[in-house]
Amino acid sequence: MKFSEMPYARPDLDAVKQQFADLLARFKAAATYAEAHAVFLEEEKLNKHVDTLAQLASVRNTIDTRDKFYDEEMNFWNEATPQLQECQNAWSRAMLDSPFRADFTAEYGDLMFVNAEIADKAFSPDILDEMAQENKLTTEYGKLIASAQIPFEGGVYTLSQLSPFKNDPDDARRLAAWKAEGAWYKEHGAEFDGLYDQLVHLRDTMGKKLGYEGYTTLGYYRMGRNCYTKADVEKFRAAVVKYIVPLADSIYREQAGRLGKQYPMNAADNALMFRSGNPRPAGDADAILKQGKKFYEELSPETGVFFNKMLDDQLMDVLSTPGKAGGGYCTSLGDYEMPFIFANFNGTQHDVEVVTHEAGHAFAAYMNRDRIPYSYVWPLSLIHI
């Protein structure tokens, strides 16, 4: 099914919560593993369906943040998601306490329980209001970024559309583009500062309500960190300072030499890799996707089938357009067992990187599309290393 044909309707939140509650009661009352397993699969299906609706609303909202319908839907999901998280937390708690835990482990592995224990540490009904407010603030941030209309050389550009000028080999033009972007950020500085300040205090409150020193520990739990700790990250940071910073310093010094610039360089000069200009795609968006199709077909039968399915079902929105949210991402549409790629092509090397980076995420999700539990589709320990 093509993305544009996928139906969306706001779910009845109270009815969905009741469905989760009924499944929870049946799960707790199960007398055998077979009974518990059957309810488990029902809960998986419901969870996947609700998540699909949420993702459809989110994707369509980010494609055009000016769309009034999906703007209202995001307001709904910002309030609904924490309440649904409460349902999920109750389910995870029941799974952890289940007399059939060993049976589930034998069939699906122990990772689902490791993750459930972490998720349990990241939630409490006491922070429902803060979670809803957090969603609202992050949505406001996305809309603010998407609203950028930056005048430059007689045109008006979004942040993404301005990027080619910020990489221009002409020093004066490149610097002017950076200044134009900086002027827009400065103009909206109070709004950005307000959102940041509110989020910092909000998340600090959430962490303290859960009994932590602040947000850091809660942040680790929310990210599902199941294979390394804060201490490990501190060691990694020390290694970055010791090994990577000197290497990066030498690379930037070489770059300054190529450009004939004094080191350290300013932000505008940092953006230019070669005096002749940065690498750029040889074609437009259609040409890039055509080459991506050729690449994935030659890579393996599986990647070929995957990428052609993405193209046929219009599961990529890559053009940079007014009102579109910034950046790029990949997500899953569970009911359809397919991923979706969101990007902002702007004529820079970033366009080609998206076809490998986000498509890499998408292929991983595609290969995991029928995994149980549904949370295994996106293993946070492996999505970004």
Explain the meaning of each model-derived region.
Residues F340-N344, R371-L380:
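Short beta-alpha connecting loops at secondary-structure transitions
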Residues R258, S276-Y336, T348-Q349:
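Auxiliary, metal-adjacent structural segments of Zn-dependent hydrolase domains
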Residues M1-N278:
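A well-structured
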